[in-house]
Amino acid sequence: MAYAVTARAALFTLATTLTLSAPAQAAVDAHCTESSMTLPPGALYPNGIARAADGTLYVGLITSGNVLRKRPGKAWETFFPGADTVFASNALRLDERRGLLWGNSPDFLSGGKTRANHIYALNVADGTLNRSLALPAGEMGNDIVLGADGTVYVTETRGGSILRLRPGEAAFSTLYQDPRLAAPSGLGAAGIVLLDDRLLAVANFGTGKLYTLSYNDPKPQLTEMQLPRLIENPDGMGLAPDGALIVLENGIQSGQGRILRIPSPKAAGMHRIEVLREGMESPVNLTITPQGCAFVSESRIRHRLLPGHESEVPDSFRLYQLPLPLTAAQ
């Protein structure tokens, strides 16, 4: 979840070049080329994005519970129209083994309405609502990651915690809470990704810091990643096939959204930040194929946060596809 947009002059173009420090190499997936696709009219502020093994894309929207689907070679269609408890569709995560599409429905930019924040799951087979779980009062989900066993992990952005729902459980519980994952702005814990079966990475949207958490330990330990600079509103994150951490830098104040790459995120010491793309309009979420093809949603929602600019709705919204640079597996 992240909510920033740049000025028209900073529009991201596919011609933007990529400068990488050696030894990063281009992704080897011959079917993944730099491209973009425009969402259909009325599909505003994309956020959640997931991709099935057959190439089907699912996209959720920040201010609507609609979930769109695009099958290979087909037009965009409405997969799920939303519901009373699904009024936003952020952070989509696909569990193909169990036939579920998980999503986050936070009461963000609610327009004066007060609604409980929910985490929900859709049945992939028919687009129906499988379950919708209300979070406790005051808690708001941000991003989601799925474990191999079907466990659902959610970043709770207001209090700075990691929530967990194991298979068979009826409600989320707090796995870990730390004031370092909160932020004065109210948007703290954001992007989350499992690095392995012991460590996860989590971003603090408000402070610009990244952390690792030993989430399977009886007493999980939170460790700040050493970075050469703060990241301006780190949002969605993903793990590349070579183990590199891909971070979307939302850039609310500067309006300069970027796609970043951090090699060897589990290593100790100072980490290097590589800029894969810049000049984007608030990149918020992504999904990465096993071959290293990334699909990124660009929300273009910053105008909603700037007084006097609320009515300046962009005329189109896009998703971007790009091959990630890969090194030997880390």
Residue ranges, per PLM feature:
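A short helix->beta-strand "capping" segment at the edge of beta-propeller domains
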Residues: 27-44
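Beta-propeller fold detector
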Residues: 35-38, 77-83, 130-134, 172-179, ...
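Beta-rich, blade/repeat-based domains predominating
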Residues: 40-56, 62, 83-109, 135-153, ...
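Short loop/turn segments immediately following the C-termini of beta-strands
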Residues: 62, 105-108, 157-159, 167, ...
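Short loop/turn segments that connect beta-strands within beta-propeller blades
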Residues: 71-75, 123-128, 166-170, 214-219, ...
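Short, conserved, GDST-rich strand-edge loop motifs in beta-rich repeat architectures
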Residues: 104-116, 250, 298-314
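Structural motif
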Residues: 111-118, 163, 209-212, 254-260, ...
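Asp-box/WD-like beta-propeller blade repeats and closely related beta-sheet repeat scaffolds
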Residues: 114-149, 155
